Each structure stands twice: as structure tokens, then as C-alpha cells.
């Protein structure tokens, strides 16, 4: 095509297309003529609801550059869907349970007490800073997990708002435990014959659906794996 001035292979699996400057000039001229509200707008979606879930960082520390990239990318996808007539819901999935949260709380508690951070804990400077804030703002009865969770989530919200990235829904993984959604999902899987027990654990028959091996949903100690709330989350959405 005339607007492509070059094509080159860049490493295994990558092809770069170089666009002509004239193409960008032509597009900008079209935008000026059509107006920013009318250009490239369509009713393709006809109001169909679409959920775009993105960023979804663990509330165990500040967002990093990779999260920022994901935020911009996800928000761009949401804007494109909206532009094409879809009813878009932007959702942030909060990973607020599990081992990473326990390690985060243990790290914060260790710093507050003046003890070394556990080897598998979080060692960033922010843990030191937040521990100092926690000592200054709270008393000994304060739960480090709940305080740290609120601190991290507040930092996430502030960082995303500074990028003009806003969410319609902040979905807590813990909420599915409180609501019984995980138990209800597991019961539905049992009723469908999609799970079985082996070695004290509950396994998903995922090989029946093209997976290379069956996956553990509930470990032998009764603790759900990361996959179990993911299944419940998708069931909630469908």
C-alpha cells in the first residue's frame, strides 16, 4: 500500500511496518474535516456490553512502569471499543488474597517491629517508608495487612488518576469468598462432573477441554489455588 514505506523482519516472530509521514498528515486532515467527535466513530457495537479488565496489580506496593504501560494500553482498548458503539466497563481486579498478601503483611509487620524482612518478603524502600507511616499514624492493634492493603490500593488509584485512567469497577478477589461465589462455583463444577478428587486435592478436568494436564483448584490443605477464584470470577462475568 502507498502509506507503507518499509517492511522488515525484526527478530523471531516480529515484522515491522513503517508508515509514511504523508499517511499521518492525511489522517490528521481527515480528523480536522470530520471533527474529533465524529471521526472514526461507528455503531458497530450497538450497545453490546464489553468488560475490559486491565492493570489488576497486586496491592503489595506501588505501581511500576510495566503497570503504567498496561494501564495506557488497556485504557486505549476501552476507548476504541467505546468509540465503536460498545458499552464499556473498565474493571480493575484486585488480587487481595493469597500468599503474596501474606508476605506483604509479614514484611510490613517486620519493619514496624524493627525486625529483618523475611527472605521471601518484600524488600523495597517503600516498605521502610510505609512502615514508618504506619508507626506514626496507628497503634499496635492495627492489622498490617489491612493497613498496607488500603495504603497500596490508594497509591494505585492516585497513580492511575494521574494518567487520566479511571475504572468503573474495582473487583476484590476476597469479595468472592465473603459472598460464597467460590463455593458456589465449585459446587457447579462438581454437579457438571468437571472436577475430581485425588490426593486430597480437587482437580479440574481441564484436559477434557484441550489443556495439556488437569489443574488443581483446591489444594489438599483446603486452600484454593489461584485458578479457583479465576474460574469463579469468569463465571460471575458470564
What spans do the regions from the language model cover?
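NTP-dependent nucleotidyl-transfer catalytic core
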Residues: 1-238
Amino acid at each position: 500500500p502507498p502509506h507503507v514505506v518499509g517492511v522488515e523482519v525484526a527478530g523471531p516472530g516480529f515484522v515491522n511496518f513503517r508508515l509514511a509521514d504523508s499517511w499521518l498528515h492525511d489522517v490528521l486532515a481527515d480528523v480536522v474535516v470530520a471533527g474529533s467527535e465524529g471521526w472514526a466513530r461507528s455503531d458497530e457495537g450497538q450497545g453490546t456490553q464489553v468488560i475490559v479488565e486491565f492493570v489488576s496489580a497486586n496491592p503489595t506496593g506501588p505501581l511500576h512502569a510495566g503497570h503504567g504501560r498496561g494501564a495506557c494500553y488497556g485504557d486505549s482498548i476501552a476507548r476504541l471499543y467505546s468509540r465503536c458503539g460498545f458499552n464499556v466497563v473498565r474493571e480493575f481486579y484486585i488480587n487481595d488474597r493469597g500468599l503474596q498478601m501474606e508476605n506483604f503483611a509479614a514484611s510490613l509487620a517486620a519493619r514496624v517491629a524493627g525486625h529483618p524482612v523475611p527472605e521471601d518478603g518484600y524488600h523495597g524502600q517503600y516498605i521502610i517508608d510505609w512502615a514508618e507511616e504506619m508507626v506514626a499514624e496507628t497503634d499496635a492493634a492495627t492489622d498490617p495487612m489491612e493497613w498496607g492493603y488500603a495504603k497500596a490500593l490508594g497509591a494505585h488509584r492516585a497513580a492511575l488518576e494521574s494518567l487520566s485512567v479511571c475504572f468503573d469497577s474495582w473487583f476484590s478477589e476476597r469479595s468472592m469468598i465473603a459472598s460464597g461465589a467460590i463455593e458456589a462455583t465449585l459446587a457447579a463444577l462438581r454437579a457438571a462432573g468437571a472436577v475430581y478428587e485425588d490426593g486430597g486435592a480437587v482437580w479440574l478436568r481441564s484436559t477434557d477441554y484441550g489443556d495439556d494436564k488437569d489443574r488443581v483448584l483446591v489444594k489438599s490443605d483446603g486452600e484454593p489455588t489461584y485458578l479457583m477464584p479465576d474460574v469463579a470470577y469468569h463465571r460471575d462475568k458470564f
